Amino acid sequence: MPVSPSRQNPSIADLPAKFILFGEDDIDDEDLLKEIIGNIDDSIYLLFVGNGKNLLDKLNELPDNHLPCLIVLDYNMPELNGAEILKEIKKNGRYATIPKVIWSTSNSENFRKTCIEAGANEYLIKPSNVTDLVDAARHMLSLC
């Protein structure tokens, strides 16, 4: 499965045409997502960034013709949380057509509402079992 080396950012030239940009600071969640999504569709490259500021920097350096097909954000990340990232992304119209998903352990209605208002297309609760995680991964891939 094509995935980014853990916590390393490939050059833009090395990114395949179709990729998902993940904001995820938990290495275990990253490894699990790599395995599950790779088993579903190994043609999609997964680029993981471990904090909100670095994710925005990576996104802003991408050319218009090489944007991710999906952005998935953990709500609780260092430097900028998922809602703060969404608000920044919303300011730039070039990201308007990219589906954006918040991926969180919190089932707080306030967090969900804040994220949807900030520009998330979906707010998914991180499942506690593998079957539900596979279903969530399939759903994310359907958005890409």
Q: Residue spans of the language-model regions?
A:
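Active-site residues of response regulator receiver
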Residues: 69, 73-75
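C-terminal output helix
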Residues: 54, 128-138
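Receiver (REC) domain active-site loop signature in two-component systems and cognate sites
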Residues: 77-79
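Conserved Asp/Asn-Gly motif in the active-site loop of CheY-like receiver
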Residues: 46-56
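Conserved acidic segment of CheY-like receiver
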Residues: 17-38, 71
